[in-house]
């Protein structure tokens, strides 16, 4: 059974880190010190699991202007295209909405823009940044 949860238990946070190491550090050859550089002990995550096995994740943050940010979206390669990532994004949106957030931003890799657009996010092409595999465009959605 596919389920998205707010990762508050240790096994859930371990699942989050497993996904990020596999999807980003192994998948894109990103050193862990860079992949986890802006995480803190207070970082909040959504974990999507299939019968307890971690398959997708994203980090959730609210900034000083009360805008929500969904960051570090990652899905294990063999689970991509099967709606796990979308379930995680929707769970993150629900968590942010419960906290009074009405505007959400996701900095998307250019190659993933279509995924976020299907979920109702609008790209702002004036925010293009990065290079190579990591050319990114900021997207936003009003709840």
Named regions from a protein language model:
Residues 109, 129-143:
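C-terminal "cap" of GNAT-fold acetyltransferases
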Residues 75, 81-94:
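Conserved acetyl-CoA-binding loop-helix of GNAT-fold acetyltransferases
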Residues 89, 96-109:
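Conserved GNAT acetyl-CoA-binding A-motif
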Residues 88, 112-115:
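Conserved short alpha-helix immediately C-terminal to the canonical SAM/SAH-binding motif I
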Residues 117-126:
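Conserved acetyl-CoA-binding loop of GNAT-fold acetyltransferases
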Residues 47, 53-62, 66-74:
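Conserved beta-strand in the GNAT
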Residues 1-35, 40, 45, 49-53:
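Short amphipathic alpha-helix that is part of the acyltransferase structural core
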Residues 62-71, 80, 130-135:
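A conserved beta-turn-beta hairpin within the catalytic core of GNAT-like acetyltransferases
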């Amino acid at each position: 059974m596919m389920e998205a949860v707010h990762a508050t238990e240790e096994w859930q946070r371990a699942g989050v880190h497993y996904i990020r190491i596999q999807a980003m550090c192994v998948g894109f050859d990103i050193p862990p010190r860079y992949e986890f550089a802006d995480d803190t002990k207070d970082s909040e995550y959504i974990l999507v699991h299939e019968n307890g096995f971690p398959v997708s994740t994203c980090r959730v943050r609210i900034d000083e202007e009360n805008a929500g940010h969904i960051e570090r979206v990652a899905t294990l390669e063999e689970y991509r295209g099967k709606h796990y990532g979308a379930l995680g994004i929707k769970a993150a949106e629900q968590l942010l909405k419960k906290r009074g957030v009405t505007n959400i931003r996701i900095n998307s890799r250019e190659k993933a823009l279509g995924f976020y657009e299907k979920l109702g996010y609008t790209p702002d092409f004036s925010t293009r940044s990065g290079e190579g595999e990591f050319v990114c465009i900021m997207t936003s959605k009003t709840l």
